[in-house]
């Protein structure tokens, strides 16, 4: 189910009638007031005047309601700020040479494509992206995918990538200390001429997987007169203690926060989620609401909090918003659909494999709300004599007499004969090696990009440009949970083997 719309709209018949200048009231009978003669005539004239007045009032009310609704959905007065500056230590080694938002997902996309596509599909075309760590590949992808000439058209909007910088003075010699500090260091942007018409600032994360119409969120925020709105998920008992939870009153106003509570503290955070629009039966199963880390601030409120009220606070979720809830109007907004924080190797692995399930919990395939990425002009994949079940094969791949089960295979992947992949996420390659180059490598006893023949791989993430030789076995049969084998080209996190980018796994190796 999509995010709840808390509006109460006028029925279509009311709106249509008002626009046509027609009364919806049942016409008075000819003799409804008085009998014949003068009394009846006076009665009918009164009825007509009343009907006209009622129609005009209804038309004015509906017109005002429609104007307010249109104003609430005006995306030109919204700017999105996507936070992509975290070090991504929990996603290491995938973040060894790239920023978190640049991590590939779904075979052909990068994590940054999710909030960017949601912005485009929501009509929000003013976007700032704040980066700090390993931002080269992220910047390259954004320039290819979302520039004005060759990528997605942004009309009168803009996409600006802003890297953390140091400036003269003691205050200017530090990096981003958190989400709020990152925005504070660039708060001068909101005084710029480009921001003069901005009313609300949408704060997004660059490492979440979900599909959302942000303007539904913005509209709810504006119509309820919120200073800050927090997007939240309904959660059941089994998962509640893994999240930061919020407590709301019967109007949806946030009145308390608790970070990963347990026991009695957890029970104290139960709320009536029907207040936010959840059906009664589902509300009983999910009596908690968890913050998604997606926020809307009134621009002036945001600047006041960052500059004057909390000038040293570093984080929105744990510092500024909880401290502000008692002073200003902070509202919760329910998003009751698929959402995943891709913050760890395990969550990254499981989210990718869930794309290959039937039916998938999330799909990149949606004709009405597509996910965008950079144009690569790759040919269709060539698959020869292979068996593929419950898997995603991206474009530009070469598969020869192999077996692939419940896996995601990224762009430009090469998989040799008699290879068996199961529960594997293969990120693909950045470039092709020609047949001549591959032949020369093999003749010299070296390993070309891709997976060599007779190799068996299970429960594994294979980063880009990896060279895996013949007769290799990767299964972590000993059940090792954590291991760092940089010199051998792999790591193990949460029992999942990660073959490093550009690494070489020699023929016959068993992992």
Curated annotation (Swiss-Prot):
It holds the Pfam family NTP_transferase. Gene3D superfamilies: Hexapeptide repeat proteins, Spore Coat Polysaccharide Biosynthesis Protein SpsA, Chain A. Activated by 3'phosphoglycerate, inhibited by orthophosphate. Allosteric regulation. It comes from the Eukaryota. It catalyses: alpha-D-glucose 1-phosphate + ATP + H(+) = ADP-alpha-D-glucose + diphosphate. Its EC number is 2.7.7.27. Expressed in leaves and stems. Pathway: Glycan biosynthesis; starch biosynthesis. It is an enzyme of class 2 (transferase). Residues 1-58 form a transit peptide. Its main location: plastid. InterPro entries: ADP-Glc_PPase, ADP_Glu_pyroP_CS, NTP_transferase_dom, Nucleotide-diphossugar_trans, Trimer_LpxA-like_sf. The keyword Iron-sulfur does not apply. GO terms for molecular function: ATP binding; glucose-1-phosphate adenylyltransferase activity. GO terms for cellular component: amyloplast; chloroplast. It is found in: Plastid, Chloroplast; Plastid, Amyloplast. GO terms for biological process: glycogen biosynthetic process; starch biosynthetic process. Keywords: Allosteric enzyme, Amyloplast, ATP-binding, Chloroplast, Nucleotide-binding, Nucleotidyltransferase, Plastid, Starch biosynthesis, Transferase, Transit peptide. Heterotetramer composed of two small and two large subunits. Involved in synthesis of starch. Catalyzes the synthesis of ADP-glucose, a molecule that serves as an activated glycosyl donor for alpha-1,4-glucan synthesis. Essential for starch synthesis in leaf chloroplasts and endosperm amyloplasts. Belongs to the bacterial/plant glucose-1-phosphate adenylyltransferase family. This is Glucose-1-phosphate adenylyltransferase large subunit 1, chloroplastic/amyloplastic. It comes from Oryza sativa subsp. japonica (Rice).
